[in-house]
């Protein structure tokens, strides 16, 4: 058999120049590896929703990464059927490029969309290409918990079929947390601990000091306490608890709420704000660049939330942005989850149970009334990021893992 020409192919729906974390994290990894002795390519979707660069070429090389983009049907993701069409459309379009995999020694594939791993499974069978799997979310369990999938239906059976072959044939799995690693070991019995490495996500935000321009940009007064939520408002996020806490505090002029992002709960959040008359809540679309930097800078604390039943199946990427930004964290999460434990044990904020609006309100007021302590929480959050989640830590782990898998 002819020796393979290249080392690593990234297979993911989102990639450079898109600005969502599902694009920036793989691109960060790809360019780091390309600059550290690996030959790297990427097969990804043509950018649309998260792109501000205008038209981009179907093929180009960026920072040593050879990128090929695929056009596919991309519908509005608010409806479940549209999201399914997007998933299968991209996967089918990528499958039509299966010949490309023959050139690579390994493929790294991501869990979004969850049907995508079928392609490297096929590539391994026909070309002997090794593959690695990055588990951003664990399917189908995350879909069960968020009530977007019923056990036994067609999509569920498809996912289970893919999973059976995925975990049997994968060379290595990357979990985002040790909690997720344990979930995989408990529920994917063909996996062993030596085939799973925990590599947390990282962030791009730096700690910025807010200025008058930043406050005025978002309509706040200097000194107001701003509780911010950034990121996805999807099936996995509990937005109700935050909205209810904002409703309780709507007459407290010291506290303002800023909700920024996208997702299939975005319209419900918008409707709740309007129907409840929450003039203390400002909702904005996905921000990036200077707008996002200033929004983070004026935040006094930041909220991370997950619905019940998701322990071990996912990890919110914005949590790491909050830490790197040096912000105290309010976690609306299950009490025995890794997020709750870390927030409490590292003293970087407060964790409250999903649905407990009164405890969330109390935690916010505690931060408002003891701002020096809140600032100290933020300083501890930044220390935690630098010592546990920093970009360089993750990249060194990826480099060592690929060196081992490829016997380099």
Regions flagged by a language model, labelled:
Residues 118, 122-127, 153-173:
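Membrane-proximal helix-turn-helix segments that form the acceptor-binding/catalytic region
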Residues 203, 220-237, 243-246, 258:
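Conserved donor-binding/catalytic core segment of Leloir-type glycosyltransferases
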Residues 260-261, 266-293:
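Nucleotide-activated donor-binding/catalytic signature segment of Leloir-type glycosyltransferases, i.e.
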Residues 1-66:
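N-terminal subdomain of nucleotide-sugar transferases
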